[in-house]
């Protein structure tokens, strides 16, 4: 894992950055709709010198902030902690922000789902959240191809749509964000229960219900809001 962390993953990141830049060169930038902007052109400032100056300025700004933090702050002073002892760890410890939704999936999975096959116990309380999480990530990655297949639209698009002008796509995105947000909040069910003096079981049940009905409600409300905004724009134009 150490060699993977310090060599392979950084190399993959560098390769992916190169692939990203090649895709930008091939497919060009997307841009907002406006006069003279189509799917076949790129309107804006050239790479040299405007964007190079911006990127260089941002780089040195971030570099300066990181250098200042490194020179003035003590981060993770392990020499003050002493030998590792897991016993003092508090019960309110929370997962890192990027892994919280997976922790929430484990917490919100109903217990008692274990299945025994040929003497081997399969912990469905772990397998179901794992499968659901992988399916969610797969759907997010596959959505552009699914929409392309459903709409039969094979053209390249480089002009950005306003969310209201693509109500179904926007509603699906809102449903996905709601699904992720409920799982992410589910990682803190214990803190929610203690801070609001509620029963942990009640919080878990409420989160489970929100996980099932929340995306549907978000889809319906978002789509109706987009259609209403479209009608409002039409009234203004007419």
Predicted regions located by residue number:
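Membrane-embedded and interfacial regions of multi-pass energy-transducing membrane proteins
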Residues: 1-238
């Amino acid at each position: 894992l150490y060699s993977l962390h310090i060599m392979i993953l950084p190399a993959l990141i560098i390769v992916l950055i190169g692939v990203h830049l090649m895709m930008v060169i091939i497919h060009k930038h997307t841009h907002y709709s406006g006069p003279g902007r189509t799917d076949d052109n790129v309107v804006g400032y050239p790479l040299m010198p405007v964007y190079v100056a911006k990127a260089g300025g941002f780089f040195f700004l971030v570099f300066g902030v990181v250098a200042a933090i490194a020179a003035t702050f003590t981060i993770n002073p392990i020499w003050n902690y002493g030998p590792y002892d897991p016993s003092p760890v508090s019960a309110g410890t929370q997962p890192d922000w990027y892994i919280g939704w997976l922790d929430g999936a484990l917490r919100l999975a109903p217990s008692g789902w274990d299945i025994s096959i040929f003497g081997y116990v399969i912990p469905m309380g772990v397998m179901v959240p794992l499968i659901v999480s992988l399916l969610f990530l797969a759907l997010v990655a596959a959505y552009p191809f699914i929409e392309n297949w459903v709409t039969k639209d094979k053209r390249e698009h480089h002009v950005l749509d306003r969310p209201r002008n693509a109500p179904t796509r926007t509603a699906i995105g809102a449903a996905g964000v709601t699904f992720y947000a409920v799982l992410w909040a589910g990682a803190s069910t214990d803190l929610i229960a203690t801070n609001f003096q509620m029963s942990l079981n009640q919080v878990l049940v409420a989160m489970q219900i929100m996980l099932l009905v929340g995306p549907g409600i978000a889809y319906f409300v978002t789509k109706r809001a987009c259609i209403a905004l479209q009608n409002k724009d039409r009234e203004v134009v007419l």
